[in-house]
Amino acid sequence: MTNMMKALVKAKPEEGLWMERVPLPEIGPNDVLIKVRKAAICGTDVHIWNWDEWARKTVPVPLVTGHEFVGEVVDVGSAVTEYRIGQRVSGEGHIVCGHCRNCRAGRGHLCRNTLGVGVHRPGAFAEYISLPQHNVVAIPDDVPDEIAAIFDPLGNAVHTALSFDLVGEDVLVTGAGPIGIMGALVAQCVGARKVVITDINPGRLALAKKLGVRHVVNAREEKLTDVMRKLGMTEGFDVGLEMSGSASAFRDMIDVMNNGGKIAILGIAPTGFEIDWNKVIFKMLHLKGIYGREMFETWYKMIALVQGPLDISGLITHRISADDYREGFAAMRSGEAGKVVMDW
């Protein structure tokens, strides 16, 4: 093994990413060195490519990007006991402090000192990545590499969907991006009654239908009240999963929620927006923000789901070499792709 590797780097404070040779990551006593097999492009990576306001405020330059991956252990620190060389693994992309109140209470996903892999520290768009052993997750033999490579966004979907009891409930998902589609499929898998997903992008809606979401709605062409009437719903949705970051979608969701309904909010809006808080109050709605994955309960549940009834393979629309990364980012930026997985 040489001391240099190929990596996709945010090398300059401007639009784009660049393939460069960078030093191999060093590992400490508690770290695991992983040879990356496959890595997927996330919406966060697109923000970093675009160098938008969030990226400019958040991402240090230069930085190896990427955080959705699967790979193989090639070296371990002297204190690592849980992982062995040759083992297939992925990793939790949020590095937590371990000493704040939430971490000490077992709520690491709420750590106030979280560092993001590929956002604050070197990431997975590289031949190798180093992670603390606490963040490494073993991948079962019956889970394919390309599915393990998208566990990070699947975890977002699972965390959001399983925030509330869904058995026998009517569920509205706003936003048919990859995470929204996976959230809808999870809801169906665990026993929701009616699951409706909305978007205004025909390509995304077609992908949702292809993957098996039962009720797919173009919000520009059909009113949710009409959809509810067709489905025999008389009182509104019990659970909402907001995956779009769209002000109009969120307002529409509030309008059609049943009294006492629960909304899990993962979609990030580009700017702040107003909602009618009187509706939230008088409907007695429960709003819950979602960030990342519960460590590590979400990982256990999503692995069990893909080993069982949940098939998300159709969500991967582009399989490319890492050298063709520009093509992959173009597909993601077009809004027409599902998941783009790169071979390293």
From Swiss-Prot:
<comment type="function">
    <text>Catalyzes the NAD(+)-dependent oxidation of L-threonine to 2-amino-3-ketobutyrate.</text>
</comment>
<keyword id="KW-0963">Cytoplasm</keyword>
<feature type="binding site">
    <location>
        <position position="68"/>
    </location>
    <ligand>
        <name>Zn(2+) 1</name>
    </ligand>
</feature>
<keyword id="KW-0479">Metal-binding</keyword>
<feature type="binding site">
    <location>
        <position position="97"/>
    </location>
    <ligand>
        <name>Zn(2+) 2</name>
    </ligand>
</feature>
<feature type="binding site">
    <location>
        <position position="111"/>
    </location>
    <ligand>
        <name>Zn(2+) 2</name>
    </ligand>
</feature>
<dbReference type="GO" id="GO:0008270">
    <property type="term" value="F:zinc ion binding"/>
</dbReference>
<dbReference type="InterPro" id="IPR004627">
    <property type="entry name" value="L-Threonine_3-DHase"/>
</dbReference>
<dbReference type="InterPro" id="IPR011032">
    <property type="entry name" value="GroES-like_sf"/>
</dbReference>
<feature type="site" description="Important for catalytic activity for the proton relay mechanism but does not participate directly in the coordination of zinc atom">
    <location>
        <position position="152"/>
    </location>
</feature>
<dbReference type="GO" id="GO:0008743">
    <property type="term" value="F:L-threonine 3-dehydrogenase activity"/>
</dbReference>
<feature type="binding site">
    <location>
        <position position="67"/>
    </location>
    <ligand>
        <name>Zn(2+) 1</name>
    </ligand>
</feature>
<dbReference type="Pfam" id="PF00107">
    <property type="entry name" value="ADH_zinc_N"/>
</dbReference>
<dbReference type="GO" id="GO:0005737">
    <property type="term" value="C:cytoplasm"/>
</dbReference>
<keyword id="KW-0862">Zinc</keyword>
<keyword id="KW-0520">NAD</keyword>
<comment type="similarity">
    <text>Belongs to the zinc-containing alcohol dehydrogenase family.</text>
</comment>
<dbReference type="InterPro" id="IPR020843">
    <property type="entry name" value="PKS_ER"/>
</dbReference>
<dbReference type="InterPro" id="IPR013149">
    <property type="entry name" value="ADH-like_C"/>
</dbReference>
<feature type="binding site">
    <location>
        <position position="179"/>
    </location>
    <ligand>
        <name>NAD(+)</name>
    </ligand>
</feature>
<keyword id="KW-0560">Oxidoreductase</keyword>
<feature type="active site" description="Charge relay system">
    <location>
        <position position="44"/>
    </location>
</feature>
<comment type="subunit">
    <text>Homotetramer.</text>
</comment>
<dbReference type="InterPro" id="IPR002328">
    <property type="entry name" value="ADH_Zn_CS"/>
</dbReference>
<dbReference type="InterPro" id="IPR013154">
    <property type="entry name" value="ADH-like_N"/>
</dbReference>
<feature type="binding site">
    <location>
        <position position="103"/>
    </location>
    <ligand>
        <name>Zn(2+) 2</name>
    </ligand>
</feature>
<dbReference type="Pfam" id="PF08240">
    <property type="entry name" value="ADH_N"/>
</dbReference>
<dbReference type="GO" id="GO:0019518">
    <property type="term" value="P:L-threonine catabolic process to glycine"/>
</dbReference>
<feature type="active site" description="Charge relay system">
    <location>
        <position position="47"/>
    </location>
</feature>
<feature type="binding site">
    <location>
        <position position="100"/>
    </location>
    <ligand>
        <name>Zn(2+) 2</name>
    </ligand>
</feature>
<feature type="binding site">
    <location>
        <position position="199"/>
    </location>
    <ligand>
        <name>NAD(+)</name>
    </ligand>
</feature>
<feature type="binding site">
    <location>
        <position position="204"/>
    </location>
    <ligand>
        <name>NAD(+)</name>
    </ligand>
</feature>
<feature type="binding site">
    <location>
        <position position="42"/>
    </location>
    <ligand>
        <name>Zn(2+) 1</name>
    </ligand>
</feature>
<dbReference type="InterPro" id="IPR050129">
    <property type="entry name" value="Zn_alcohol_dh"/>
</dbReference>
<protein>
    <recommendedName>
        <fullName>L-threonine 3-dehydrogenase</fullName>
        <ecNumber>1.1.1.103</ecNumber>
    </recommendedName>
</protein>
<dbReference type="InterPro" id="IPR036291">
    <property type="entry name" value="NAD(P)-bd_dom_sf"/>
</dbReference>
<feature type="binding site">
    <location>
        <begin position="290"/>
        <end position="291"/>
    </location>
    <ligand>
        <name>NAD(+)</name>
    </ligand>
</feature>
<comment type="pathway">
    <text>Amino-acid degradation; L-threonine degradation via oxydo-reductase pathway; glycine from L-threonine: step 1/2.</text>
</comment>
<feature type="binding site">
    <location>
        <begin position="266"/>
        <end position="268"/>
    </location>
    <ligand>
        <name>NAD(+)</name>
    </ligand>
</feature>
